């Protein structure tokens, strides 16, 4: 889905991802 792709792009820009490509902190988009 596009939402998942957008989250991945957001995480790449911010640089805050875990090994699953998800946000690694509660204050970030998940």
Curated annotation (Swiss-Prot):
Its main location: membrane. Keywords: Cell membrane, Membrane. GO terms for cellular component: MKS complex; plasma membrane. It comes from the Eukaryota. It is found in: Cell membrane. The N-terminus is blocked. May play a role in the development of hepatic metastases from colorectal cancers. Binds to carcinoembryonic antigen (CEA). This is 80 kDa carcinoembryonic antigen-binding protein. It comes from Rattus norvegicus.
């Amino acid at each position: 889905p596009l939402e998942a792709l957008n989250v991945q792009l957001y995480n790449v820009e911010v640089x805050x991802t875990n090994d699953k490509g998800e946000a690694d902190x509660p204050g970030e988009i998940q």
